[in-house]
Amino acid sequence: MELVFLGTGAGVPSRGRNVTSIALSMLNERNTIWLFDCGEATQHQIMRSQIKLSKLEKIFITHMHGDHIFGLPGLLSSRSFQGGDSNLTIYGPAGIAEYVETSLRLSGTRLTYKINFEEIEPGVIFEDKMFIVTADDLDHGVRSFGYRIVEKDKQGALNAEKLKADGVEAGPVFQKLKNGEIVTLADGRVIDGKNYIGEPQKGKIISIFGDTRETSSELELALNADILVHEATFEGDKAKMAGEYMHSTTLQAAKLAKTANVKKLILTHISSRYDRDASKELLIEAKTIFENTEIAYDLAVFQVGE
């Protein structure tokens, strides 16, 4: 899995940063892409990346401010124009369905695929055999969600060396043993596949937050995450301003990462007041509290778990 930051700016686009959008690429895991927020010109950013709209399976909207949703109508239309025909699910606050449907209707846009809308409340919003996604309220004036994506533990690897040492030759029987089945061998021995499977591989945890000021719900959403993506609209000494504007500072994000025992913090949603050099200072500031911090730039790619 990898995170591709398509837009990392706050509020309005700037020369160095487009507005918010993050792609979670899971091509190896499920051959799909999940998108978190879709600010204006997200589809242009996708054209500059390796992301393919045909692989897009789900879109998660954190809140209804324009810098997080104005790119949706164009992106959905282009996906259709490019031949996308698989169904798409959009998760988000109340109003997301009306916004998308009205935009498409008034522009006379007809899609070649169906959109399923899930207007969410806190709790589990999606689960299958591979992932579970939960959402909770943040604090941003309008309803804003944070998402916690948990990859379920994977079955351990089959110990082929142990099987060979026990005189079991490679072949179709290996697949049955890998599935944990009890198998009778040609020589009459009965072996249990469970005895040859290693420890389960721990799944990854990714927490992606919408805009927010400090709030108690952040801790549970971020707890023990491999990656926490958190807004850092302001530098540390502007905590009062951040609170008034319902945003966070670098230091607040770093303190949360430390308290929640996350492995890596990625800062995004950077105000246009900070150019590239000033952004480096934001990173240095956050690292004084949480060393394993990165600051995202447009089109930056981060591997999950590295």
UniProtKB/Swiss-Prot annotation:
Binding site for Zn(2+) 2: D67, H68, D211, H269
UniProt keyword annotations, A-Z: Endonuclease, Hydrolase, Metal-binding, Nuclease, tRNA processing, Zinc
Enzyme Commission number(s) from the entry: 3.1.26.11
Listed InterPro entries: Metallo-B-lactamas, RibonucZ/Hydroxyglut_hydro, RNase_Z/BN
Catalytic EC class: hydrolase
GO MF: 3'-tRNA processing endoribonuclease activity; zinc ion binding
Catalysed reactions listed for this entry: Endonucleolytic cleavage of RNA, removing extra 3' nucleotides from tRNA precursor, generating 3' termini of tRNAs. A 3'-hydroxy group is left at the tRNA terminus and a 5'-phosphoryl group is left at the trailer molecule
Pfam families in alphabetical order: Lactamase_B_2 (PF12706)
Reported function: Zinc phosphodiesterase, which displays some tRNA 3'-processing endonuclease activity. Probably involved in tRNA maturation, by removing a 3'-trailer from precursor tRNA.
Name of the protein: Ribonuclease Z
Annotated source species: Listeria monocytogenes serovar 1/2a (strain ATCC BAA-679 / EGD-e)
